Structure formats: structure tokens, C-alpha cells
């Protein structure tokens, strides 16, 4: 499967809640995104022109969503249910859409300009 899905590691849990952590080499602007239940985002792919979209690196920090994807070269496709907290890496040339099952919050580890320069719809 070309999509990489990994839980976000738990550092500590106590009566206040949980502390999770992740590491990244990326710097600069990131996107904090809120989507309402029932909405669909994405419906595009990236060619890998932008470093920030090769791969697309996203952290679902709240909620539940379905990620539908299709490899444009092999034609392999699937739908994965994502339950926060989880990290998803989507390589270039993978068409994808994200359907919010509940209200969701996610962080994209790229800037808005990186995304717009390397986003293509079919």
C-alpha cells in the first residue's frame, strides 16, 4: 500500500488527558484545518513538484475520517478509516479525498502556497 498510516506516539496519560509527540524535518508554515462532519476535502493528487507535498504529511488530531485513494500508475485503490490521533503520508501521484465522518481537526505539514502549486484535479 503506497499510503503510510502510523499512530502518533503517546508520551504520557494522566487525569488531565494525553500527551502525544511526533518528529519532523519540515520547517516553515503549516496548516491547521477544521472540517465539519460530512464534508469532503482533497479530490486531487500531487506530482511531487513541491517538497512539502512529496509526500503530503498530515496529522489527524481530532475526529474520524475516511481516506479514499487511488494510485494513478498502478490503479490500486482503497479506503482507509482514520481515527485520531494518526499520521498519514501520501506520496506523489496518489489521488486522494478525505471525508469527515465526525468534525475533524488536522495539521498539514506544508504551507498553503506549497499545496496550491502542486495540486491537480482529475
Positions of predicted regions on the chain:
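A short, N-terminal "cap"/entry segment at the start of jelly-roll beta-barrel domains
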Residues: 1-32
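Double-stranded beta-helix
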Residues: 1-4, 13, 97-122
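Conserved short histidine dyad/triad with adjacent acidic residue
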Residues: 12, 32-54
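Short beta-strand His + acidic residue motifs that chelate non-heme Fe in jelly-roll/DSBH
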Residues: 19, 43, 67-68, 88-90, ...
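Short histidine-centered beta-strand/loop micro-motifs
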Residues: 20-23, 42-52, 69, 78-80, ...
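Short, surface-exposed beta-strand-loop junctions and turns on beta-sheet-rich folds
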Residues: 49, 73-75, 105, 113-114
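Glycine- and acidic-residue-biased ligand/ion/polar-headgroup-sensing regions
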Residues: 53-70
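Short acidic-glycine-tyrosine-enriched beta hairpin
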Residues: 72-92
Amino acid at each position: 500500500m503506497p499510503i503510510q498510516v502510523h499512530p502518533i506516539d503517546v508520551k504520557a496519560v494522566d487525569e488531565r488527558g494525553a500527551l502525544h509527540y511526533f518528529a519532523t524535518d519540515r520547517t516553515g508554515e503549516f496548516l491547521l484545518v477544521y472540517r465539519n462532519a460530512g464534508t469532503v476535502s482533497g479530490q486531487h493528487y500531487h506530482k511531487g513538484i513541491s517538497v512539502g507535498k512529496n509526500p503530503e504529511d498530515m496529522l489527524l488530531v481530532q475526529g474520524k475520517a475516511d481516506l479514499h485513494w487511488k494510485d494513478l500508475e498502478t490503479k490500486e485503490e482503497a479506503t482507509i478509516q482514520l481515527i485520531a490521533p494518526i499520521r498519514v503520508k501520501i506520496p506523489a501521484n496518489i489521488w486522494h479525498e478525505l471525508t469527515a465522518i465526525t468534525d475533524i481537526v488536522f495539521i498539514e505539514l506544508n504551507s498553503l502556497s506549497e499545496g496550491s502549486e502542486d495540486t491537480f484535479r482529475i
